[in-house]
UniProtKB/Swiss-Prot annotation:
The lineage of its organism: Eukaryota, Metazoa, Spiralia, Lophotrochozoa, Mollusca. InterPro entries: Conotoxin, Conotoxin_omega-typ_CS. This is Omega-conotoxin-like CnVIIJ. Coiled coil: none annotated. It is found in: Secreted. Its main location: secreted. GO terms for molecular function: ion channel inhibitor activity; toxin activity. Keywords: Disulfide bond, Knottin, Neurotoxin, Secreted, Signal, Toxin. Residues 23-42 form a propeptide. The keyword Cell membrane does not apply.
């Protein structure tokens, strides 16, 4: 019974700490996460559409066409 009370108090304390920390950090994130395709194209140098590629290496900004062996951009929606 005593152990159960200690565990309950510990869980409540940790929950309160997380809520306080979450309120303090709201709106302070400097770099918002980008979409994965945008992040990849901005973080690495990649080959533009029409360039020669191999399907085993991920060097295209979009994707490497399997049969033609050239880079193709992702379709824009």
């Amino acid at each position: 019974m005593k152990l159960t009370c200690v565990v309950i108090v510990a869980v409540l304390l940790l929950t309160a700490c997380q809520l306080i920390t979450a309120d303090d950090s709201r709106g302070t994130q400097k770099h918002r996460s980008l979409r994965s395709t945008t992040k990849v194209s901005k973080s690495t140098s990649c080959m533009k559409a029409g360039s020669y590629c191999r399907s085993t290496t991920r060097t295209c900004c979009g994707y490497c066409a399997y049969f033609g062996k050239f880079c193709i951009d992702f379709p824009s929606n």
